């Protein structure tokens, strides 16, 4: 079955000389990627070689950039990397994978950009940021700060 599907893809590519399908899919994936990242409040570094089929967000990188090293140390000391994706699923009904299962950083999360609508990726971006901000609020409360 896989060989047949590969043969059909190859045959289709021979007929689509202008790469219309390929360009359409690449545009769709980029729009989804942009929609997700724009709604995290994080900056997506341009990469002309990015395939974009999956996107990985390293939560620890953004924890440090947004709240500092002290917050990042708090996260590592008080939570397991899987807690983030579990918290995300419980609070927002968004299910993402932990990136370490794909040889990514322990505190990374991974989203497939292949199967949801663009608006769903906006929700994912907002949900990821919401959970990170909730952890930061817990950290501030633990330090005795109110906000």
Enumerate the language-model features and the residues they cover.
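PLP-dependent class I/II
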Residues: 1-147
């Amino acid at each position: 079955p896989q060989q047949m599907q590969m043969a059909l893809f190859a045959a289709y590519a021979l007929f689509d000389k202008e790469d219309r399908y390929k360009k359409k899919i690449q545009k769709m994936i980029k729009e989804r990627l942009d929609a997700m990242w724009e709604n995290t409040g994080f900056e997506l570094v341009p990469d002309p070689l990015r395939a974009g089929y999956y996107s990985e967000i390293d939560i620890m990188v953004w924890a440090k950039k947004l709240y500092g090293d002290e917050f990042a140390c708090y996260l590592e000391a008080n939570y397991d990397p899987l807690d983030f994706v579990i918290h995300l699923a419980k609070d927002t009904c968004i299910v993402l994978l932990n990136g370490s299962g794909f040889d990514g950083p322990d505190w990374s999360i991974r989203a497939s950009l292949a199967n949801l609508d663009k608006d769903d990726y906006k929700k994912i971006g907002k949900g990821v940021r919401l959970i990170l901000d909730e952890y930061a609020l817990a950290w501030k409360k633990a330090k005795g700060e109110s906000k």
